[in-house]
Amino acid sequence: MHIVFFSTSNVFRAEEILQEANIECRVVPTPVQDKAYCGVCIQTECEQAKEFMDDMEFEVLE
């Protein structure tokens, strides 16, 4: 799944949070969509990753 943000700084903040929680993730280019997101996003297979970012605005693309 891809976790997309409107801000690049939030992508790198989320990456740090997930790595500290030992959740495997990586920063990748954002898939092309109808909406405007920043150019990179988080890619992970861990569904629980969303729980660590409850104070951040994001959307999930599957």
Model-inferred region functions:
Residues H2, E24-R26, E59:
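Structural motif
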Residues A14-I17, A21, E51-M56:
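Generic non-transmembrane alpha-helical segments
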Residues P31-Q33, Y37-E62:
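C-terminal structural segments of small proteins and small subunits
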